[in-house]
């Protein structure tokens, strides 16, 4: 089966699994809540548990596994972009997170899932890891993967994130973005057949010169969305209906609209973030990163 295309929550998929002895999960994730491989993984484990099929995870490095940041998902923002109370950047491998899903009883199962994780050898989450394969066509390299936690939730806004250009997730902009000179024109291609603002000139910010491979700030760069909100004309609706699902909270949109500073925003999600950091410790398979 193509795991990303199968509807693991459907009765049809459950019937298709009949007779299968083992399901193996081997995907390169990026360690961001709204990157939906982990939601697919959770549905897969649930479907397999229903039929008592064991699951084997071949663990892979988390390229954003060296920090934890962002709001913890609130229950009223639950969607395929986030099913469980974890922050945007959760600092765990897929194997570790799967163990947490089971251990915290987050999954909708009647039978305890049979899960085995084949761990990595010598994994050091303090170091930025090189990826053997691109996680997806629009996350082409490690640089875009590192930018993704700070950019991905902007897909719930009026901004283009460069889909349909040579540099998706390395820039962001809008046809009416004010006060900048960088520009790009999204064009349909085999990967992005209907990119936002196709054939229109978008003005905005290029991130390609940032040296995050060497000097990562170890946090979500909130200044990007705060700057973008101030740079789009007020008559243009900035937030779209999916933003709360991306951010995992209804508070962030309101805070930005009310002009909250980065420090004020971080203070709102700090308590739940600290609780998650403690909660995740019991599920770690590898030494934690420093200053966790």
Language-model features and meaning:
Residues 29-41:
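Glycine/threonine-rich flexible loop motifs
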Residues 50-54:
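A short helix->loop->beta-strand "cap" motif at the edges of active sites that frequently abuts
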Residues 56-78:
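Glycine-rich, charge-decorated loop segments at or immediately adjacent to ligand/cofactor-binding or catalytic sites
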Residues 121-198:
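Glycine-rich, aromatic-lined ligand/substrate-binding cores of catalytic
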């Amino acid at each position: 089966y193509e795991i990303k295309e199968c509807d693991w929550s459907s009765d049809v998929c459950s019937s298709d699994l009949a007779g299968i002895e083992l399901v193996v999960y081997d995907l390169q994730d990026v360690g961001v809540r709204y990157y939906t491989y982990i939601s697919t993984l959770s549905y897969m484990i649930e479907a397999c548990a229903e039929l008592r099929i064991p699951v084997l995870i071949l663990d892979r490095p988390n390229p954003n596994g060296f920090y934890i940041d962002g709001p913890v998902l609130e229950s009223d923002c639950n969607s395929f972009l986030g099913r469980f109370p974890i922050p945007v950047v959760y600092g765990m491998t897929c194997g570790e997170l799967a163990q947490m899903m089971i251990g915290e009883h987050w999954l909708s199962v009647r039978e305890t899932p049979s899960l085995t994780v084949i761990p990595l050898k010598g994994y050091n989450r303090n170091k930025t890891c090189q990826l053997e394969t691109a996680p997806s066509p629009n996350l082409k390299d490690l640089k875009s993967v590192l930018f993704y936690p700070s950019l991905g939730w902007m897909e719930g806004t009026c901004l283009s994130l460069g889909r349909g250009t040579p540099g998706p997730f390395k820039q962001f902009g809008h046809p009416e973005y004010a006060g900048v000179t960088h520009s790009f024109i999204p064009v349909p291609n085999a990967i992005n057949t209907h990119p936002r603002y196709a054939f229109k000139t978008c003005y905005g910010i290029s991130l390609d010169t940032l040296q995050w491979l060497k000097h990562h700030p170890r946090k979500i760069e909130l200044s990007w969305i705060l700057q973008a909100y101030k740079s789009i004309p007020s008559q243009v609706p900035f937030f779209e209906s999916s933003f709360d699902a991306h951010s995992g909270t209804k508070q962030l949109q309101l805070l930005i609209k009310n002009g909250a500073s980065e420090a004020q925003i971080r203070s709102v999600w700090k308590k739940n973030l600290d609780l998650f950091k403690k909660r995740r410790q019991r599920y770690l398979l590898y030494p934690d990163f420093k200053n966790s």
